């Protein structure tokens, strides 16, 4: 990453599930802490799959985090001595997080936001696309497709072992769903509207 010469900016870490987003966020948090910077870490209260008060990677690494229900709550915990604001699972917040993050960066804070850029349908997820557009730095990570081993940019939702339908809720709380990384060609979403362009190249994949 290039070196910032001024204080106050936004970094976004995005990708599919199992791509190492939380691991990368934790790495940046620990690096800042090693540099004696004050870091405040946040996560949405809805994200309690592994822990209610920690950011936990799939490798088992973790850092303590403050669970918040709304973006505006971040301001209650951030002070003039804070240097870095880290936010995990940012896709679960409302679009209000965009203004909050912009305000923090404009006030001189280094903001690091990590989250899914696509939902299980393979469509833009919540505020993440806007944050990517506004960020000074975007790191898009890829996992490994569980079907073919190719780079995976999408998240496959499975319900009882079968691909979830397009009409399923974007966010499921307390459901018995499972997820795995998939590439573009092995990502399955039954019921997803087809988009066919009237162009000869559109038929190439089926030839």
From Swiss-Prot:
Compartment(s) where it occurs, according to its Swiss-Prot or TrEMBL record: Cytoplasm
Disulfide linkage: none
User: Spans of biased composition, class Basic residues?
Assistant: 184-197
Residues binding Zn(2+) are 145, 148, 183, 186
InterPro entries from the UniProt entry: P-loop_NTPase, Thymidine_kinase, Thymidine_kinase_CS
Positions annotated to bind ATP: 15-22, 88-91
Kindly give the PROSITE patterns that the UniProt entry links to this protein: TK_CELLULAR_TYPE (PS00603)
GO MF annotations in UniProt: ATP binding; thymidine kinase activity; zinc ion binding
The answer to whether keyword Ribosomal protein applies is: no
Give one Pfam family.
TK
Keyword annotations for this protein, in alphabetical order, are:
ATP-binding, Cytoplasm, DNA synthesis, Kinase, Metal-binding, Nucleotide-binding, Transferase, Zinc
SUPFAM superfamilies recorded for this chain? Glucocorticoid receptor-like (DNA-binding domain), P-loop containing nucleoside triphosphate hydrolases
Active-site residues annotated for this sequence: 89
Reactions listed under catalytic activity: thymidine + ATP = dTMP + ADP + H(+)
One GO cellular component term, please give it: cytosol
Q: What is its main location?
A: cytoplasm
Description of how the protein assembles with itself and partners: Homotetramer.
Family, as annotated = Belongs to the thymidine kinase family.
- Recorded protein name is Thymidine kinase
The organism encoding this protein is Geobacillus thermodenitrificans (strain NG80-2)
């Amino acid at each position: 990453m290039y070196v910032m010469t001024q204080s106050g900016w936004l970094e976004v870490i995005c990708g599919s599930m199992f791509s190492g987003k939380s691991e990368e966020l934790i790495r940046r948090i620990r690096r800042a802490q090693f540099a004696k910077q004050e870091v405040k870490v946040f996560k949405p209260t809805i994200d309690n799959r592994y822990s209610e008060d920690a950011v936990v990677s799939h490798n088992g690494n973790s850092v303590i985090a403050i669970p918040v229900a709304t973006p505006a709550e971040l301001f209650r915990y951030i002070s003039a001595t804070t240097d870095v604001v880290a936010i995990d699972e940012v896709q679960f917040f409302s679009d209000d997080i965009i203004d909050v993050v912009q305000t923090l960066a404009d006030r001189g804070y280094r903001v690091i936001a990590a989250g899914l850029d696509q939902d299980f349908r393979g469509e833009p997820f919540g505020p993440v696309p806007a944050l990517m557009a506004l960020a000074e730095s975007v790191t898009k990570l890829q996992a490994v497709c569980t079907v073919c081993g190719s780079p995976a940019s999408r998240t496959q939702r499975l319900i009882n072992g079968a691909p979830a339908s397009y009409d399923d809720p974007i966010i499921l709380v307390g459901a018995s769903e499972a997820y795995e990384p998939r590439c573009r060609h092995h990502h399955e979403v039954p019921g997803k509207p087809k988009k066919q362009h009237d162009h000869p190249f559109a038929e190439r994949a089926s030839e």
